[in-house]
């Protein structure tokens, strides 16, 4: 499930997401794998899980302070990937 964590982080950089929004945005991820990734990332302190007292229940996942501190690293990785993709497309 680790290959999904970077994609989850990429989404959470933009805004908080609900579980089904994340699942639909990550083509090919199973519900179990997404659940496991989110739990692991929450346990590691990278994301937060907020449950709202609403009917139906609403749960949102967002970057924690630790997760936010990873923003420059993730952005650098994204830039590298885009540059690499561009260079390999030219060859």
What function would you assign to each model-found segment?
Residues 2-33, 54-60:
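N-terminal helix-turn-helix DNA-binding core of bacterial DNA-binding proteins
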Residues 45:
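Glycine-centered, phosphate/nucleic-acid-interacting loop/turn motifs that mediate DNA/RNA or nucleotide
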Residues 85-91:
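HhH-family (HhH-GPD) DNA N-glycosylase catalytic core used in base-excision repair
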Residues 49:
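Short beta-strand "wing" residues that participate in macromolecule-binding interfaces
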Residues 53-77:
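Basic, amphipathic "hinge/linker" alpha-helix immediately C-terminal to the N-terminal HTH DNA-binding motif
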Residues 34, 38-41:
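Basic amphipathic alpha-helical segments that dock to polyanions
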């Amino acid at each position: 499930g680790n290959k999904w964590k970077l994609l989850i982080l990429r989404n959470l950089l933009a805004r908080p997401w609900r579980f089904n929004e994340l699942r639909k945005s990550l083509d090919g991820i199973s519900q179990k794998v997404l659940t496991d990734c989110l739990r692991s990332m929450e346990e590691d302190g990278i994301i937060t899980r907020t449950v709202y007292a609403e009917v139906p229940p609403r749960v949102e996942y967002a970057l924690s302070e630790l997760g936010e501190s990873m923003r420059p690293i993730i952005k650098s990785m994204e830039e590298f990937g885009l540059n690499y993709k561009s260079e390999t497309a030219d060859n």
